[in-house]
Amino acid sequence: MMSNKKAINILLAEDQTMLRNALATILDLEDNLQVVHSCATGKLALEYMQSDDGAKVDIVLSDIEMPDMTGLELAQHLFEAKARSNTIILTTFARSGYLRRAMDSGVKGYLLKDSPSHELIAAIHKVHQGGAAIAPELMVGSWMEKDPLTDKERRALRLAKDGLSTEDIASKLFLSTGTVRNYLSSASNKLNAKNRIEAARIAHQNGWL
């Protein structure tokens, strides 16, 4: 629903179709909120934001875990590109580490999916006005443990979690197999893990992947 005031244009990135459609309906019913585009992957969201239409987006509302590209990776790309939009993460994950990475990626809002719709709407308005909106239950735990992984270790572990071999990981990251082994070994040592699978599990549970 739109009033005479300029609408806040929203891009919605969520891989669950039913939830994506429900969110779009809720937001479009609100005064001065307009979902101008919705998509199921972070990669599609980034492609839209890099198009001419992307310049009109005020708020990117994104899930974290999506195919091709996570919401945190999407936020990082937009942050580095100095996009005029602001990003709000809406997720089921209250894991330690996610909020820290989100803030480092320029995210201005971080809410859980079980938050009431009025809190989400208020957060969108607050972020659009230059503020920040963080679910209070996330503020303490997310800062207790610092992410010990480098970006390269994180990328290698994420692919290991998906079951890829060292050779396949090396191919995807355009690295030598020896370099990949070093990254995985370093990550395992930092996390006190017995192997790459355990390291990936620990990192995932802490929100570091």
Regions found by a protein language model. Give the residues of each.
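Receiver (REC) domain active-site loop signature in two-component systems and cognate sites
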Residues: 66
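Conserved phosphotransfer cores of two-component systems
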Residues: 50-55, 77-85, 105, 206
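Recognition helix of helix-turn-helix DNA-binding domains
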Residues: 165-198
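Short, flexible helix-to-coil linker/hinge segments that flank and couple to helix-turn-helix
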Residues: 97-154, 208
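Conserved acidic carboxylate
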Residues: 14-16
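Acidic, metal-coordinating helix/loop segments flanking the phosphotransfer/catalytic sites
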Residues: 38-59
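Acidic catalytic/metal-coordinating carboxylates
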Residues: 41-44, 70-74
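Active-site residues of response regulator receiver
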Residues: 63, 91
